A protein has these predicted regions:
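Intrinsic structural disorder/low-complexity segments
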Residues: 18-19, 31, 298
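Ubiquitous "structural anchor" signal
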Residues: 10-12, 28, 32, 186, ...
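Aromatic (phenylalanine/tyrosine) cluster motif
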Residues: 5-10, 29, 35-36, 41
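Positively charged N-terminal leader segments that act as targeting/secretion signals
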Residues: 1, 18-27
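Helix-centric, low-specificity signal for extended rod-like, repetitive segments
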Residues: 9-12, 20, 24, 288
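Short, solvent-exposed coil/turn linker segments
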Residues: 4, 24-25, 280-281
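Non-catalytic cap/lid and distal C-terminal segments of serine-dependent acyl enzymes
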Residues: 36-315
Length: 315
C-alpha cells in the first residue's frame, strides 16, 4: 500500500468536527483572523489524534450511471502503510452518518478487535430502485433495470479509482455489504462475480425480489424469488462466506401464513439454498436474528460490529 493514505491525515476534521467546533470559533474570526486559523488547525490536529478513524468524502463522476456518486471513505489511522488491507464496499452509504459508523469503527479499532480495512460507503442515487436489484433479472415491476450499469460502475469506475487514488495495487480481500435493497444488490454482485470477493454481508435484505407478483395466482416462492433462483442455478465458489441479518420486527407480512414474517422466511430459505449448493452452515454462513430488530438503520448499526468481528475479527 502506497503513500496515498497520507491524504486521510487531516480529513478527521470532517463534518462532525465542523459542527462541534466552527460555530464556537467563528466569533473569533472578526477579532483575530490569524488566531482563528491557527486555532482551527490545532483543533483539527487534536481531533485527528483523538480519533483512530480517518475519513474522506469524494464525488466520482460516473459515465455508466450518468450522475455524480458521493462516496465516504473510512480507514484506521494507526495502520502501517506496509500492512495488507482488505476492502469493504457498502451500499446505501448515506446511512453511515445516522448509524454512527465512525463511532462503531473507533471503538472496534481502539479495542483492537478487527483487522485493517478500507471502508467505502457508496451513497445511493435518486434512482435507487433501478440501480439496485439483480443485474440479470428485473423484478415483476421492471425495477432493477440499471443494476447492470451499477455493477459496471463498481468494477470499471469505482475500483480503479480507489486503486489509483490511494496507491493500492491489490487488496488482501474484498467484500460487499448492504441493507434492504442495497443488501440484495451487494449479494447479487458478489454471487455473480465470485472471483472478486470473499464475503457478502446482507442486513434485512430484500430477498423477496421476485419475477411474478405474489398476488398472481401462479406465484410460487420456489420458482419466482430471483435471488434464490440465482443461487440454485449458480456455481459453487468454496471461498465465499455469507453474513445474513434479520429482525423479528422487520415487517409484519406473512404471505404463506406460517407464522413467520416474510423477511425471515426469505432469508432462511436463502440459507437453505446456500447449504444445498455446498456451503457449510457453521463454516461459511453466519445468521443473526435480532428479536427486537426493526427494518431501520439503528438495528443495522447494532448488527454491524457483529458482522465486522465475524468477517475480520482479531483472534
Amino acid at each position: 500500500m502506497g503513500s496515498g493514505f497520507s491524504k486521510f491525515i487531516f480529513s478527521a476534521s470532517n463534518k462532525q468536527i465542523n459542527r462541534a467546533v466552527l460555530s464556537d470559533l467563528s466569533r473569533l474570526f472578526t477579532r483575530n483572523p490569524v488566531y482563528y486559523e491557527i486555532l482551527i488547525f490545532e483543533t483539527m490536529q487534536k481531533a485527528a489524534k483523538e480519533s483512530v478513524i480517518l475519513t474522506e468524502n469524494v464525488y466520482l463522476e460516473s459515465q455508466f450511471l450518468q450522475r455524480e456518486v458521493c462516496i465516504d471513505f473510512f480507514f484506521p489511522a494507526t495502520v502501517s502503510t506496509e500492512e495488507p488491507v482488505s476492502l469493504l464496499l457498502i451500499n446505501d452509504g448515506q446511512d453511515m452518518e445516522k448509524m454512527n459508523f465512525h463511532k462503531i469503527l473507533d471503538r472496534l479499532y481502539s479495542e483492537k478487535e478487527i483487522e485493517p480495512l478500507l471502508f467505502v460507503a457508496i451513497h445511493a442515487g435518486e434512482e435507487r430502485k433501478m440501480e439496485y436489484g439483480t443485474q440479470n433479472h428485473l423484478d415483476y415491476k421492471d425495477r432493477g433495470a440499471k443494476a447492470p450499469l451499477y455493477t459496471s460502475f463498481i468494477f470499471d469506475e469505482l475500483l480503479p479509482f480507489i486503486r489509483q487514488k490511494y496507491s493500492i495495487i491489490s487488496f488482501k480481500e474484498k467484500a460487499f455489504a448492504g441493507f434492504s435493497l442495497g443488501g440484495l444488490s451487494a449479494l447479487d454482485i458478489v454471487w455473480n462475480r465470485p472471483g472478486e470477493f470473499t464475503k457478502a454481508g446482507i442486513f434485512s435484505a430484500s430477498l423477496w425480489w421476485r419475477s411474478v407478483d405474489q398476488n398472481d395466482e401462479y406465484y410460487d416462492d420456489d420458482k419466482h424469488r430471483i435471488m434464490h433462483q440465482q443461487i440454485r442455478n449458480g456455481k459453487y465458489a468454496p471461498w465465499l462466506k455469507f453474513f445474513l441479518q434479520c429482525g423479528n420486527l422487520d415487517e409484519i407480512k406473512d404471505r404463506n401464513k406460517n407464522g413467520i414474517i416474510d423477511s425471515i422466511d426469505d432469508t432462511l430459505d436463502l440459507i437453505k439454498e446456500l447449504e444445498t449448493k455446498g456451503y457449510d452452515r457453521e463454516r461459511d454462513i453466519y445468521y443473526l436474528e435480532l428479536a427486537d430488530g426493526h427494518h431501520d438503520v439503528f438495528t443495522w448499526g447494532r448488527a454491524m460490529p457483529v458482522f465486522l468481528k465475524w468477517g475480520w475479527g482479531i483472534k
